[in-house]
């Protein structure tokens, strides 16, 4: 599997959409479960998982085929989870500061 993964990564690096689709098919479910475990929300996990693959495609020129693809998508998705939690905390803090009118 490792050789196939490396071959797919080389092809993705060269903008091969079929290879990207194959990586997506091979890794999406595992990544989705990984993200659901972190965020405890399947809709949010789906958004983060899709954004992760979008970022892989956008930065495909920087791919290193010798490295584990799952490690890459796990790192990207973890960073996206952290971003979500940070933004949620800020949003919550601002919502708490809004005075309630009419009560």
Positions of the model-derived regions?
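Amphipathic, Lys/Arg- and hydrophobic-enriched alpha-helical face
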Residues: 24-42, 59
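Sigma70-family region 2
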Residues: 13-14, 53-68, 88
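Residue-level preference for short helical/loop micro-motifs built around acidic side chains
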Residues: 21, 33, 43-47, 67, ...
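Internal acidic/polar
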Residues: 2-5, 91-103
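Arg/Lys-rich amphipathic alpha helix in sigma70-family domain 2
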Residues: 61-65, 78-95
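A short, charge-rich alpha-helical start-of-domain segment used by transcription regulators
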Residues: 10-31
């Amino acid at each position: 599997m490792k050789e196939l993964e490396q071959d797919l990564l080389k092809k993705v690096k060269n903008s091969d959409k079929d290879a990207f689709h194959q990586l997506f098919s091979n890794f999406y479910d595992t990544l989705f479960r990984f993200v659901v475990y972190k965020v405890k929300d399947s809709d949010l996990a789906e958004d983060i998982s899709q954004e992760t693959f979008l970022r892989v495609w956008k930065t495909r020129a920087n791919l290193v085929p010798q490295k584990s693809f799952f490690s890459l998508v796990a790192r990207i998705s973890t960073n996206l989870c952290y971003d979500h939690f940070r933004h949620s905390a800020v949003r919550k803090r601002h919502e708490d500061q809004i005075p309630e009118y009419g009560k």
